[in-house]
Curated annotation (Swiss-Prot):
Residues 131-419 form the Peptidase S8 domain. It is found in: Secreted. The gene is SUB2. The keyword Secreted applies. Secreted subtilisin-like serine protease with keratinolytic activity that contributes to pathogenicity. This is Subtilisin-like protease 2. It comes from Arthroderma benhamiae (Trichophyton mentagrophytes).
Amino acid sequence: MQLLNFGLLLLPFVAGDLAPQPEPLLAGPSDVVPGQYIVTLKEGLTSAQIRDHKKWVSSVHRANLDSFAAGASGVETEGIMKHFHIHDLNMYSGGFDEKTVEDLSRNPYVKSVHPDQHVYLAKTVTQRQARWGLGYMSSKGKPVPLHSTLVDYSYDDKAGEGVWAYVLDTGINVNHVEFEGRGILGHNAIPNKPHTDEFGHGTYVAGIIAGKTYGVAKKANVVSAKAFDTGSSTYNYILETYDWIVRNITDSNRKNKAVINLSISGAKYQPFDDAVEKAFKAGITTVVAAGNDGKDAKNNTPASSPNAITVGAVRWENTRPSFSNYGKLVDIWAPGELIKSCWKGGNNATSTQSGTSAASPHVAGLVAYLMSIENLPSPSAVTARVLNLTIPNLVKDAKDSPNRVAYNGIQERKFKLPK
């Protein structure tokens, strides 16, 4: 069975360091949650078949617990825990003994059984400069001064108004002044933890999407969907949160006015790639980070989900930072080094960070921005428009990636500029 290390994508660096290096992803047996699994069911099952399958699982699990073989494992298991339904994809998490896992893997209704994983957050260090990223988004890829605060960012004054950006992350400080009351507490999957952001990552990402100073879509709403806390998470919580987001977007009838940002990455994990793909088929746009391994993104999840918008990081002078993943699955490049945004520790707190965690929300913000000013009825239309606006052949050392830099299209439209 596949092992996975899965984490948020901000990189550690010290003040003055302009070439931060990524921490290695350390996958190993200790990452596995003992006795806990994610089970994916085959497509096309009826509600009655799924209900009967769950009854069968409970019966088999109970019988195996009564046997000596199950008790000998030393792991307490609790059976089915949570069910996830994304479009026509059905999965569930559960605590099972080894014999039950063997029985599940042979069940005709089961597509796959994967061990659940701990998910680790990258360490970050504060560095106090840089505001180049926004200016880059409206400059057609023209190199901009790194530390200048005078770079112009031109945009239509609708600026994401009436659009919802869902941030699956560590939570958001919705009281931060940058959000001007547009922050919403959506879902908290972490048990016995408040719906706050004690780590900073989610607030930082949300600020790049929709902060009044640091955001691409300055009037968009940001919805906190907390699947991480301080240090680690598992797919049990990540899938629960992603499932909630898809349901909330669908039930609120806002598929063409919503975007999901996933500034997370780990080794290839098919069940979650499948979930992102099913959301796309349901009419929902997801923007994801390419990853910080300095390798081909095809081996990362959710970057390898074929219809997510996968974002690599570019520096202010159009070079690829050594940490950014690359490859044919990287759809677009956006600012991802020394980017300033909101932070933990207070309603005015800020921090400057690097990583594809910063690049992804630039594009999620661009999606929200475009949704507010154009009729983009489907994820395919969103992706096509975002890619149509890109500036080609600017990124040095893009490897074999599509060489396309994010751009908001302002110079091609007679938009009213902000006051």
